Amino acid sequence: MAVEFHLVFAVPFSPFTSRVIKNTWLCHLSKLIKTVVIVGGGIAGWLTAGRLAAKHQSHKANGLNVVLIESSNIPAVGVGEGTWPTMRNTLKAIGISETDFIRECDASFKQGAKFAKWCTGKDDDFYYHPLVLPQGFGKVDLAAHWLAKQGRVSSFSDEVCYQEAICEQGLAPKTIRTPEFSDVANYAYHLDSAKFAAFLQKHCQEKLGITHLVDDVTEIHSVEGEYDSEKGDICSVVTQNNGEIEGDLFVDCTGFSSLLLGKHFG
């Protein structure tokens, strides 16, 4: 059975990586995909690799072959990173333990965003964007009722959901007995990006059978396009130490350098 892919696409880091991959199935070219080559590591590269490998059983003999090529000349930067609640589904789909993830990536729960001194600039002025949806969301506009309320003293988020109160009390969105990835209140994560990338790499190699090459891509080869001036789909990349790497689908996870989409296709 042929799986529909466009033969190269870029995946910037985003909590919606799994959605990007899912939508890529709908592209117009049809080809039987046996080997996927991902150029670029980091969170974007390893999330992409993990999602594909877990979905298509790369750890089995007849599964999808996933190869990730990562340059050693790009240092890992350990900065704080915020995610969206959909990250929980992504981690679960890859087969990651939430407990291990929290411990090894210095992760903490994210329940929303609080914008201090939002309107007046005073210390007690703020705007909350919680991750729990307002009561009756999609059925009734509570904002109009809140605006019409005379002498209001509470914020909009406090009027329409309970998450602001949880945050102000310094409470977690779940208890110690709540199952992994389940919640009492909706949540995402804050984490150390360098530790998260290393954690994903270890899991993907040990549990999902992904091939990891630490190397630099020096050349990119395409099949002939429909017109003489057009570059066709990428068929292989040449690396400095491992030679030519062929594939059926190439994913650009090189970030701002955009090695495949930007520099090659331009």
Where are these regions (language model features)?
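Helical element adjacent to the flavin cofactor pocket in flavoenzyme catalytic cores
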Residues: 187-217, 241
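Dinucleotide-binding Rossmann-like beta1-alpha1 core, especially the glycine-rich loop
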Residues: 75-167
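Flavin (primarily FAD) binding-site architecture
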Residues: 253-266
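Glycine-rich FAD pyrophosphate-binding loop
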Residues: 54-79
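Core beta-strand elements of the Rossmann-like FAD/NAD(P) dinucleotide-binding domain
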Residues: 240-249
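Acidic, Ala/Val/Gly-enriched low-complexity intrinsically disordered segments
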Residues: 2-4, 8-11, 20
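N-terminal Rossmann-like FAD-binding beta1-loop-alpha1 element of flavoenzymes
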Residues: 34-62
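A conserved short coil-to-beta-strand element within the FAD-binding core of flavoproteins
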Residues: 213-233
